[in-house]
Structures are given as C-alpha cells and as structure tokens.
Amino acid sequence: SSLRETTFSASASGSREILSSHKIRITADALAEEVDYSDVDLVVLPGGIPGTPNLAANKTVTDTCTAFAKSGKKVAAICAAPSVLASLGLLEGKNATAHAGFQDKLAGAIVHDEEVVVDGNITTSYGLGGAIPFALELVRQLAGPAEADRIQKAIAYRH
C-alpha cells in the first residue's frame, strides 16, 4: 500500500474544519481524541500560529507525543511545533531545529539552524522552506530510501 492510503489527519482544535493561518480550509479525517494511535507509526505536528499553541493545549496531542517519544515511535514537528516537543521535555539532550523565531524555545535541545534534523525517533524541521526535505525524510523513514528517491525525482526536487 502507498503512504497516501495509510495517511490521515487529525484535528487538535475540537472541530474537523480547520482554517489555517493563511486562510486555507482543511477538513481533518478525525478529531485527535477519536484516533486509535496503536497502529500509528508517526505523529507529525505541523506548526504555524495559532496551530502550535492549539497543539500544545490539546492533552491528546501532548500525551500522544510523549507516549510515542518515550516508546521509540516516531514523532516529527516542523516550523514552531518543535517548541511543543521541547515544552514536554522530549528534546532534552537531543539535536533539533525549529523556525528561527522559536529556536530559543527549544529548552534542553542542541539547536541546529538546518532544514531537517533527525535524532533517533524525533525529526524536526525549521519551517516551510524545509517542508520538502522534511517530507522526503519522513517518507525515507517510513517507506525506505528508494521510495523517497522516487518521489524526489517525480517532483523534480534537486536540492
């Protein structure tokens, strides 16, 4: 099966209808509270404002990230969202990155100003400019390097 068939979105806002910070309407597949995470391989926090504070305020999100990180399951965050992982103590002693305006919020982390940073089961990216390498790294982790290479070629990403 492809990654698309096994990917779903969950809303942390209490509504399946989400309006992004850039006024893009998204309909999540479920509310975060409705998901059975036992078969989930990776949790991704998308970041942005007000998305990041909404993620930080959702107990299901924070409990799930903590459980995943502590059990060795994959957790990823981009833009401002790595600050949520830091606030939970999940970046303590780990290499990480975040949007430049949030790097000072990565308490306990070894901060790198790079597109994507992987440390064990935690992957972080600095923001929209790193979204493609971030996504390709997650594909590599879940489906292997051949699939990541195939997608990179298909989207003509030469970075």
Can you say where each PLM-predicted feature lies in the sequence?
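Extended, subdomain-level signal for the structured scaffold at the beginning of enzyme domains
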Residues: 1-75, 84-93, 105-113, 121-159
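Short, thiol/selenol-centered motifs that function as redox-active sites or metal-ligating centers
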Residues: 78-79
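Cytochrome P450 catalytic-domain "roof"
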Residues: 118
